[in-house]
Amino acid sequence: MTHDRDARCPMCGGADASLRYRITRFEVLDCRACTLVYLWPQPSPEEIRAMFATLYTTGEGSVPELRDYYGYCYEDAPSNPLVQLYERWLDALERVREPGRLLDIGCGTGLFLAVARRRGWQPFGIDDCAEATQHAREHFKLDVRGGDFGDFASQGHRFEAITGWDIIEHSRAPVELLGAMRRCLALGGVVGLSTPNQRSILDAVAGLLYRASGGRITKPLEKFYIEQHFLYFTPETLAQALGRAGLAVAELRRELTDLGRLTLSPATRLGLRALFGVARLTGLENRIFAVARAANGAQMG
């Protein structure tokens, strides 16, 4: 794998970072200026595109537990836990903005857009994965195209809502991504985001094992810090990124991964359920969900 040489923080550009963990393929760094946690070295843009070209057919290959995770992206049924999650996220969007034109960046198979359409949204999607976008068009009959959001954002389209579920952690330039999302908002529009929470029970336990072993026990960390995720946000750093992009938080909450979507041994599932119980009590849930809108005075496109 080739890597860019510049180790500056992807959010603030700071060059001063401390080492949090050193694991098999990369280091986990803390920016001393803005506190963003990020991986180093990071893959090149070409390698990033290759990673996601077959994501929905192969999953995130370095994590066997995600083998079946993407299978839930194909079935629009009330019993599907992913559909239930999307309904909750749409509830949050609709508390801030009534349905209108909706763009889902990284829309994948189109399941979220199909759920949104039933609720009165006018859906549109964009994704780099050709197999997924084909499914969205043929199975869900959605207006979805392949390609890069950066190119799309310059074409003057406007939406009442723009969503990016689990995309910001894949970005090498998160503030620029969020700024482009803001510029594509119609007046009064909203942005919806989800991403892993770096300050989670998973990092806490894996980090404890790493430090107690003098850095020799890294396997638990390698389940959490994976090469497809370049950035790891906390609620505070995600709010900071939104603010740097001219967006103001309307709602931000912590959530837990649905273990039913993961491929786990019975013992691992039981252990994670216990950890997630602790997470609920301590505020160390492993996911972040946010809704934001253009800050006062921030210019939209």
What are the roles of these predicted feature ranges?
Residues 1-165, 174-180, 236, 254-263, ...:
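Conserved N-terminal segment of class I S-adenosyl-L-methionine
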Residues 119, 139, 187-188, 245:
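Structured helix-beta-strand junction loops
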Residues 159, 172-184, 190-296:
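S-adenosyl-L-methionine-dependent methyltransferase catalytic module, highlighting the catalytic core
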